[in-house]
Each structure stands twice: as structure tokens, then as C-alpha cells.
Amino acid sequence: MNTFLWILLVIIALLAGLVGGTFIARKQMEKYLEENPPLNEDVIRNMMSQMGQKPSEAKVQQVVRQMNKQQKAAKAKAKKKK
């Protein structure tokens, strides 16, 4: 019976570590993406140039603000959903 108890405790500890690690990794990834968004001003300027638009600073800043607003709305919606 003692061996069975040890095996059960090891399995429970592994499952708890897996679940905990998943949540910690998810939070760290969300924080990283919030601090370092994949699309920055330089990327937006480059995309506008490739589409044939002249990337004025006002247009670039408008797109950046829209993206930030959408990210905040999506984050708020996700928190509300929980």
C-alpha cells in the first residue's frame, strides 16, 4: 500500500506541475506580447509602402492607436469572459 501511495503522489505532483507551468507560461507570454507587440511603427510604415500608400506619421500613429485599442478591447473581453 505504501508504494501505491507514493506512485499516486508522484502522479498528482506531475499533473499539478503541468497545470501550473501552463498557466505561468501563458501569463508570461501575454505580458511579453503586451510589452513587445509584433507589429510596431516601422513594420506598419513598411506595410503601407508596400501597398503603395505614402506612410505619413499621422496615418502610422492612427493605425498604432487603433491596434492598441483593439488589443485592449480584446483583453477586456477575455477578462470579462472568465
From Swiss-Prot:
Family: Belongs to the UPF0154 family.
Presence of the UniProt keyword GTP-binding in the record: no
Entry's localization field: Membrane
GO CC terms: plasma membrane
Annotated keywords: Membrane, Transmembrane, Transmembrane helix
Name this polypeptide is given: UPF0154 protein SMU_1719c
Principal subcellular localisation of the protein: membrane
Cited InterPro entries: UPF0154 (IPR005359)
Transmembrane spans: 4-24
Membrane topology: Single-pass membrane protein
Entry keyword Endoplasmic reticulum: no
Top-level lineage group: Bacteria
